[in-house]
């Protein structure tokens, strides 16, 4: 009886960091028992995906991944939260308020390194401004975390203290979404919102043993801290 009860309860398949690899995603869904019907991957009975963010950048199938994820959400077969790459994309494409007489800039600098990290997404939407705005609009709907009756989900680190700091500035309820003001604050180095989002979406960082120690990440960037 207890086994039958468990089988009838909602179960979740947790999928993170797709990074533009639609073929890998569909292969995984197929292995998990999901089937396509009318262009949407549908879940087995009492199952649902929770996507943990980082849908974009790196891989060659940016639009395809977003199409799969959004279709599953719209039909009730998936939930999704924000990753640091979606947060970075919003900041990259959101103009900052400029002082009179100074040039406009963005919440995330358009530096060489930032452009390189975002290159595949930029290329995918280089001649599709409508599609770009639709993608950004989708990112704005993504909560920073889920706190459901039987499961919690966050992209990197579940940190109650930082979540508490963000609660007054994000959309209330069970879905904690950034509005424009909180996006601006979270993109401003040194603010409580900045530090909170860094931890929730990237994880807690600790310095290496000494200043002399460092390593190169997969993007070739020198790092002196680890998560």
What residue spans do the PLM features occupy?
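N-terminal active-site segment of His-dependent metallophosphoesterases
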Residues: 1-67
